[in-house]
């Protein structure tokens, strides 16, 4: 029976507090005020560098409930927001229509998605190096240009799974770029992030989260948030 590594869980995620609020490192809304995240989408920072099996219950059951209660409390204290003429909504509508209007000369969604998967598997698999991760990052950033011309064959606006797959691919490229940038920045091995060019853990320089934020022009900025150590002190595993 052939056996190979596969993706089980994506560590990291949208930074939240314990109540699901998508706050920045200073504990204030940044980006979309009132945005909450829950479950395995969110990163509350409870798992360290490698989440163990079944510990997803902490994300889904405990913090899922806390996020729901937090969102309910926020909604009860804040008035309804009218998005009908919101610039953000209009921008999203234009993005959807732009994908539908693309000429049939670009890549199919499945082709571009496979190219992304191959590049990420090669450069950001189980064992990583600076060179390999940079090659993957360059490839993903090149795919962004190809994505602008990606072909959506179904031009309908109802139950259009081809359009959904195209939109998902855009989000995957965002995540792939973030994974590559974060991996290159973390010049150590920690948890499931294993670098052959930096094989040891570096608590002095990397006991921190690397937070990435995408700006309106597509630029990615980095922030850092220190790890809060309470009862259990970090030690070398022997």
What positions do the PLM features span?
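Active-site Gly/Thr loop motif
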Residues: 1-10
């Amino acid at each position: 029976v052939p056996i190979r590594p596969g993706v089980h869980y994506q560590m990291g995620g949208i930074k939240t507090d314990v109540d699901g609020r998508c706050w920045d490192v200073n504990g204030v809304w940044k980006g979309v005020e009132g945005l909450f995240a829950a479950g395995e989408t969110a990163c509350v920072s409870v798992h360290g560098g490698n989440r163990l099996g079944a510990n997803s219950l902490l994300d889904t059951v405990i913090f899922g409930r806390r996020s729901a209660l937090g969102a309910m409390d926020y909604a009860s204290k804040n008035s309804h927001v009218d998005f009908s003429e919101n610039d953000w909504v209009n921008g999203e509508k234009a993005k959807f229509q732009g994908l539908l209007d693309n000429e049939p000369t670009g890549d199919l969604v499945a082709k571009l998605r496979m190219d992304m998967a191959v590049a990420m598997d090669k450069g950001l698999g189980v064992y990583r190096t600076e060179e390999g991760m940079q090659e993957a990052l360059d490839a993903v950033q090149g795919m962004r240009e190809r994505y602008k011309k990606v072909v959506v064959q179904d031009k309908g606006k109802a139950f259009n799974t081809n359009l959904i797959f195209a939109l998902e691919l855009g989000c995957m490229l965002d995540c792939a770029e973030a994974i590559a940038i974060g991996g290159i920045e973390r010049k150590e091995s920690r948890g499931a992030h294993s670098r052959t060019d930096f094989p040891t853990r570096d608590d002095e320089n990397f006991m921190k989260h690397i937070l990435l934020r995408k700006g309106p022009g597509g630029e990615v900025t980095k922030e850092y948030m220190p790890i809060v150590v309470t009862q259990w002190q970090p030690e070398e595993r022997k």
